[in-house]
Amino acid sequence: LFDNNSKLLSVSGMFAGQGEITGELPGELFRYNKGIENLSVFVGGCHGITSLGDGFLANNKAVTNVYYMFFGCSNMVGTIVPIWTNTYCPLITGTDVSKFQDCFKGCTKLTNYKAEIPTQWGGGYSPASGASEE
């Protein structure tokens, strides 16, 4: 989809709320967009998205904003790669929640929603207490 857009920097809100988008987002969706920075609300509210392909964002180290990226994608299942760690998105870790707030809010069918996804990222895990929040 974005193969011929090597200078792409932002897809903020591009497909937000589009019910027609269904299935898996390919793991290599942004493989040619190594400089992409802003994915805020990219597919937020797209209830038809069911999963992320292997390696999603693995080669996109310039990402600085995933605010509400998958907010409300309530049919996503499986285990999400830990984009909240330095390994995946080194420029958005830390305490500036405006860059990642509620990225996975409402994605409660994810296998690691309660066990790994931090509450500030929209998950149910509280790193401070080491416990999931109900």
Where are these regions (language model features)?
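Negatively charged
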Residues: 1-134
